[in-house]
Amino acid sequence: MPPPAAVASLTLQVPGGAHDVTSLATSPRTMAVPGTTEQLTIFYSGSMVKFDNVPREKIRYACRLRRLYSSLQRSLQTQDTSMFPSSSSLHIQTKRRGYSVIRLLREMLMVCSSTRTKPMLVHSDSIGAQRTGTPPSRRRIHARGKSRSCQEMSHCW
C-alpha cells in the first residue's frame, strides 16, 4: 500500500466566505466524535454544507439513497432505447403536428361578419374572400379551394 499523500491546503469559495479545508479537518468541531453521531458533509453546486451530530443511521440511509439514485441513473443511461423514436423522427412529427395545428387555426379563425363588411380569413398571407349579395347567414367563405357557410363554422365560436 502506498504511503499517504501529503495534505495540501485547499481553499473553497462558499457563500459564507473562503475556508481552509485543512484547518476545518483538524479543528475540534469537525473531528469525528466516538459514539452514535457523526458529522455529515455535503458538497453541492460548488458549496460545502456541514451538519454536526447526525445519527449514523441517517447517514447510512442517505448513502443508500445516493447509491440507489446513481445506480438508477446508470441503468437508465445504458438501457436499450430502440423502442423509443429517434430525435429526428420526433422533429418530423412535431413539424407535421404543427402544420395540422396551423391549418386548424386557419379554419377556426375564419370570420363571418353579420354586418356588410366582407368576410375574410384572419391570417397574414391570406386574401379576403369576395363579398356576395347573399345574406351573411348564407355567405360562403373561400379559403384554399374549400368553401364553408357561416352556419357550418358556427361551432368554432
From Swiss-Prot:
Keyword Nucleotidyltransferase listed: no
Domain Tify intervals: 33-68
BP terms from Gene Ontology: regulation of defense response; regulation of jasmonic acid mediated signaling pathway; response to wounding
Residues of the signal peptide: none
Chain intervals for the UniProt region annotation (Disordered): 126-147
Top-level lineage group: Eukaryota
Species in which this protein is naturally found: Oryza sativa subsp. japonica
The protein's name in its UniProt record: Protein TIFY 8
